[in-house]
Amino acid sequence: MKSIWLASACILAMPGIAAAQSTLPSATSPAAAPPAGASTQAAPAAVAPDNGPNNDIVITATRRSESLSNVPIAVSAVSAQALQNSGANDIRALNQLAPSLLLSSTGNEANASARIRGIGTVGDNPGLESSVALFIDGVYRSRTGAGLDELGQLERVEVLRGPQGTLFGRNASAGLINIITAKPSFEIGGNADATYGNYNYIRLAGGVTGPIIADKLAARIDATYVKRDGFYRDITGTDGEDNNRNRYFVRGQLLFTPTPDVTLRLIGDYSHRSEKCCAAVYISTRETSDPTANPTTPGFNTDHAVVTNPSNRIVDILTSLGNVFPTPGDPYSRQVAVTPGRTYRNTTTDWGGSGQLDWNLGAVKLTSITAYREYKAGGAADTDYTNVDISYRADNGNSYRRFKTFTQEVRLNGTLFNDRLDYLVGGFYSKEKLQLAGNDKFGTQYGAFASCRLVATIFGPSAALRNPAAPGCLSPVGRATLLGAFGPAGPSLAAGFDRLSTINDVGDNLALYNQDSENY
């Protein structure tokens, strides 16, 4: 068991003005002049609808409801209307509304990463928690990929830039994404949305809210269904179309207000995705290098590479093994080559529930948030991205990541000394169980590819020295050259090449890793 201990408490005095922030002016009144050191963004479409008595924009980014103009942090508030106008359905679309935020995913959609001001945690290791924290309705989501699901009707999204560890803990060193969904209402209402687009894209979304007991109990339910054909076409295997969408989401809420000072909000949600992701196309098949970028290693491949050889030894090897490069150099052809019998598949389920109690005790406000969540993402992939069988993850259910998380947060917020001191003190506890299952394997042509790659590295791009069908990928000329070039060591090297070429279809049927962590 791995235990991680974290203890924190804070008492904060609120400064008079913000040191740095993004101020979004009101849609109904002229924007006030920003305080010294602040910047202004004139973006009425992004005004949050939760406004205070003076028509100020009210946010909860500091664990309390405050006017945006008084918050001493750099924060952007994006309203539900702005999200709808932009077509945003999940947090990836926030890139266009919060320029300092970058969200991306590679390999599969469970490997999402978030960066704010260029800083974040990048990698597909499920043990890595993002340095850009994600909160949905006050509940911490330990992996950014959990936010890539449909989110239903939202009230607003807050993007906090810079370290937020004082209020949000160790996993907010780069920033924070705070998502607030639409609450139940004591007035009957609803929304519906239908969208159709190319690749047979269909999105149906709707919600309904209203009272169950007048002024005491209200409910809300939101649901979304999305389906789209894949936009990559497999021309060699049996995978059909890749990178499609097939997902649905449902969330139910209850809002209970037994007295004017007590509010209890209960939320339960479930989402499911079953999609074929993520195939990739080739940008170029030419061999490139930049000898000036690394003088100690001539020919080292770099970002600003230049074409030094119209041929490519790896491409030549793959071609000799039967690989097909659909319209090389044209990534917009959207044609991919998948090994026959292999597939891309991702299945994700994410569900959980939370309860938030807000109790006004007079001079002090008590907030308690209790939550439990389960998340599982798994699938299969042709991990070499070619129709040559080099490596893969089998479609047998033995490749997945699963998280079970319980969190409890308690906060007290109040004022002292005739409102001269505004304080916030609280505690946080979490327990998480992580299980990672892997089944990565070498394919049936791995040995031939690996040995040919070594031969090409030692002797250069000359195809006359290679024979993928021969032991060690050595043609008669290549074997003679190897034996002659390395003298007494030649026979041992040749034997090693021969053994390497026999490593095929080996790997893990199931490798299981478990981790338990406890934080408070």
Mark where each language-model region is:
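N-terminal Sec signal peptide and the immediately downstream disordered periplasmic leader
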Residues: 1-86, 93-96, 260-261, 353
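Structural signature of outer-membrane beta-barrel domains
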Residues: 14, 64-66, 110, 121, ...
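Acidic, small-polar-rich N-terminal luminal/periplasmic segments of exported/outer-membrane proteins
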Residues: 53-187
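Outer-membrane beta-barrel translocator/receptor signature
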Residues: 112, 129-131, 143, 152-161, ...
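Outer-membrane beta-barrel transmembrane strands
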Residues: 144, 246-251, 255-261, 267-269, ...
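Periplasmic-side early beta-strands and strand-to-turn transitions of outer-membrane beta-barrels
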Residues: 178, 185-187, 195, 209-308, ...
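Extracellular/periplasm-exposed beta-strand and loop segments of Gram-negative cell-envelope proteins
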Residues: 195-197, 232-234, 239-243, 279-285, ...
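A surface-exposed, glycine/aromatic-enriched loop/edge motif typical of exported proteins
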Residues: 264, 268-324, 433-492
